[in-house]
Amino acid sequence: MNLPPNPVIARGRGRGRKPNNVEANRGFAPSLGQKSDPSHSEGNQASGGNGGGGDAQVGPSIEKSSLSAVQMHKSEGDPRGSVRGRRLITDLVYSRPPGMTSKKGVVGTHITVQANYFKVLKRPNWTIYQYRVDFTPDVEATRLRRSFLYEHKGILGGYIFDGTNMFCINQFKAVQDSPYVLELVTKSRAGENIEIKIKAVGSVQSTDAEQFQVLNLILRRAMEGLDLKLVSRYYYDPQAKINLENFRMQLWPGYQTSIRQHENDILLCSEICHKVMRTETLYNILSDAIRDSDDYQSTFKRAVMGMVILTDYNNKTYRIDDVDFQSTPLCKFKTNDGEISYVDYYKKRYNIIIRDLKQPLVMSRPTDKNIRGGNDQAIMIIPELARATGMTDAMRADFRTLRAMSEHTRLNPDRRIERLRMFNKRLKSCKQSVETLKSWNIELDSALVEIPARVLPPEKILFGNQKIFVCDARADWTNEFRTCSMFKNVHINRWYVITPSRNLRETQEFVQMCIRTASSMKMNICNPIYEEIPDDRNGTYSQAIDNAAANDPQIVMVVMRSPNEEKYSCIKKRTCVDRPVPSQVVTLKVIAPRQQKPTGLMSIATKVVIQMNAKLMGAPWQVVIPLHGLMTVGFDVCHSPKNKNKSYGAFVATMDQKESFRYFSTVNEHIKGQELSEQMSVNMACALRSYQEQHRSLPERILFFRDGVGDGQLYQVVNSEVNTLKDRLDEIYKSAGKQEGCRMTFIIVSKRINSRYFTGHRNPVPGTVVDDVITLPERYDFFLVSQAVRIGTVSPTSYNVISDNMGLNADKLQMLSYKMTHMYYNYSGTIRVPAVCHYAHKLAFLVAESINRAPSAGLQNQLYFL
């Protein structure tokens, strides 16, 4: 049986509606003396202002949402550095070493910065009780649940209700011979008696970590007074929407917020965000397919499969898994009241008239999580009621679209600070928000938090012939290649260029430019052998690669007429798996001469030469590495876009960059999207073997940077990956006669964080590190801005040291991490993360997107994936 979203039936709830304990947006009763206004609460729901569908259903899986149940999971919300969405902190993962009195460094120029945080000056001093609320017969609509419960506000007192859980300042005594503390009765509009049964779950003290769950609920209740609309997880302001009519989309500005305990104070983190809301519906996409394609069904299906859509009538999002062309809005499904057609259902429930009665239905299948929670029915959705969200690949590839969006989304620091202060002012001036915060004795500071910070000493970039460039605030040394040679060159004597015959002249001109450019950098590139192909079919490219690889070239350059994902995938599969050889793929559009910008082609040639040198184990530049015998490791994960059950974990390690420019890399496939790699210890053993073969010894120290950690996985990383890795390393080192074991530091690197900080009204310069105030007391962590941006606000990167016995202090770890952001050879400047992290990302992305299998081991010592 296939159902529409939120049908009136006990099973088959809307996708993603497995109740959880932190759905802060699900309607709140007046709290602690707040003036009651039931019409306002219901009115918001009717308008969709309180998101998540004021009609989501509740079922037997609800017990899992209690605080006591959550505590069983060692979850930290989002290990990327913030509490994402409605997930709140329960058990914390402590990474700060016992006895560590200070994790702050002292090296560098001391400055003061502002951050996008506000102090919580006052907070409640209470014990609050949590209850679970059940309705008999079951009431699916959350807005009705709120309304029915609100009728008993006199008995309940001040409370917060999210549709499932009620937080209340009153403790109700247990009823004898009953699991419930309160059993209330109310009447529906039809005159039916509705029993409301309230069961005690637990309590939260003002000193408990769970208090932040309640504080975030209260904050979201206060934000409701700002006339914001909840879409998915965050609140957005439709009144301030920005219409991009030429691109059929709107940008809704919004806020991502989180209250939690930081180093010394409880702070509210507030970040400005934007939601892309397309003005077209799935029906518009269907109409375009019918108009433009002979096989409209296949075209429409390709366009919408995997798309996330928004249904305005219940403000919920769904992922499209299939299209049922055999079903129409006239089809019927079963409810508790009997069968009903989709047309009649939407008319009766939402007063919506379906106009096209022949349109197909799109399907959203339940996830494994939904099924475990009892949501085992597919959801059927009417195309004309489903609005497309997000951006298509075509939009992302359209420079005009991106430029139009960036004018509004890439806020400079001064505009971002102004918006943050305006948000704070609205919270402190809106009557409903003020009453909500005041009733719970919560007060926010008006000023952004000020933080002590430091600017680390600038790095020295080492080139050939002992030339040195001291990196400045631009964090870019591209121009230095005009006068400097690369640190270590690999001369190219045997190489092939595969090009379509009709484009031979343009290809030869570009190759000659590369040869001249290399010569100016003291790198010798001989003339290549040209392998002309009569056409650009995949099979033709494959045959040409086979012909070239048979002659053992150092590298193969392949020219494509235009970007083509399928063709690129074919080339990379051939050169990375079937006939392993380093390859450099270029497109004619990039390498063809341009009259308008002749110097631009020289810049492209320079970048290509640098890439080719790096792929052949050369070193375009170097930084000063103070430690001998240091192996740095990067690990990242990329999910396969073609198979959601597959992901690829890439492992990249250096072989002591002070003495060697070889790398070790490998990729493992993982099933069911799991971002934890059981193969990590095996990969590490292989990397150590490669290191031993080159140096006749094991590394003195290992610095491991772990990227790709998803929500709530920090506990698993600490207790499975790190512990397994340490055990394996100790075993290897002790078997080699090193009884003290391995000295390793393991750092979680997180880019997707909401923290921002500013120097005055400007971006902080590269090397600005923050290790106080907004860091977390349970962590050994710091924030680092390593890159420079020209437009918008720079994003810091979070470093969480979860294991450390290298014997280096905070200063040295921070400076080492900063050094490693200078070593990415695909860009002559600093990047957001240590280079090995980005190398791992590039490799995982290449395999997930193009190769779909493990590359040949014959390439594992080269940066062939650049």
UniProtKB/Swiss-Prot annotation:
Post-translational modification: Symmetrical dimethylation of arginines (sDMA) on Arg-11, Arg-13 and/or Arg-15 by csul/PRMT5/DART5, is required for binding to tud, localization to the pole plasm and association with the correct piRNAs. SDMA on Arg-11, Arg-13, Arg-15 and/or Arg-17 is required for binding to krimp and stable recruitment to subregions of the nuage. Methylation state does not affect protein stability. SDMA plays an important role in ping-pong amplification of piRNAs and is essential for function in vivo. Methylation state functions as an indicator of its piRNA binding state.
UniProt region (Disordered), positions on chain: 1-61
Subcellular location: Cytoplasm; Cytoplasm, Cytosol; Cytoplasm, Perinuclear region; Cytoplasm, Cytoplasmic ribonucleoprotein granule
A Gene Ontology cellular-component term: perinuclear region of cytoplasm
SMART domains assigned to the protein according to its UniProt record, in alphabetical order: PAZ, Piwi
Residue ranges of domain Piwi in the record: 555-852
Alphabetical keyword list: Acetylation, Cytoplasm, Developmental protein, Differentiation, Hydrolase, Methylation, Oogenesis, RNA-binding, RNA-mediated gene silencing, Spermatogenesis, Translation regulation
Major localization listed first in the record, in broad terms: cytoplasm
Bias (Gly residues) ranges: 46-56
Role this protein plays: Component of the perinuclear meiotic nuage, a germline-specific subcellular membraneless ribonucleoprotein compartment involved in production of transposable element-repressing Piwi-interacting RNA (piRNA)-induced silencing complexes (piRISCs), which are essential for maintaining germline integrity during oogenesis; essential for the formation and/or structural integrity of nuage particles.
The protein's name: Protein aubergine
Gene designation per UniProt: aub
